[in-house]
Amino acid sequence: SSLLSKLKIKDNGQIVISLLPGSRKKEVQYILPILISVSKLLSKKIRKPILFLCQVAPNQEKLVDQILKKMPNEIKIVHKHLLGNELTSSSDYAIITSGTATLEYALNGIPSIALYKTNFLSAFVGRRLIDMDKIILPNWILGKKYMDFIFQEKCNPEYISEKMIKLIKDKNKPNELLVYAKKLRDLLTANDKTFKENIKNIIEAKLNF
C-alpha cells in the first residue's frame, strides 16, 4: 500500500493490525501497555507475519515514545495528523480505544475490536451512568452488535488476543462487515445532509425513543 511505502516498510503480504490507544493521556497510559502485550501474543499465536501500526495523537507523541521504549516491541508509529486516514484504509484489522474512531473503521468495513480501561472509580461510576450498549457508535446506530466492546476487567492481553484470533479466523466477517458499512453510509448520508447532521439526528431520535 502507499502507506507502507511512505513508512518505508516492505509489503510482504503481512496482516496489518492498527492499534489506537486513544488521544487522552490516561487512555494511553492504561491502554498502550496492554496493546503492546497483545501484539506479542498475536505474533506468537498467528503463523502469518503481522505488522502492527500504532496511531499516535499529536499531543501524546512523547508519552507513546516513552512507553514503547520501556516495553520491547515491533510496533511501528503512524502520526495521526499526517497519515491517520491512510492508516484506516490500509488496515486489515484494528483494536480501537472506544470513541469516534470506531465509526471511522466501521464505515471502512475494517474488522475491529473496541476496548476501554480506566481506574476503578471511573469504571464504577461509568457503569451506573452510561448504557454500555451505546458507547460504540456503529453498534448503536445500526441497532446491532457490529463491533465487540471489551471493558475494564476483561481488558487484558489474553482475552483481547483470543477475541482478535477469533476475528482473524472468521473468513466471512470482512464481507459481512462491508454490508454493514454500506448500511452505515446510507444512514449517515440520508436526506442530503452531512454526516454530522445525520449522526446528531440519529442520536436524538434514539434518546427520545
Predicted regions and their residues:
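Nucleotide-activated sugar donor-binding and catalytic core shared by glycosyltransferases
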Residues: 1-209
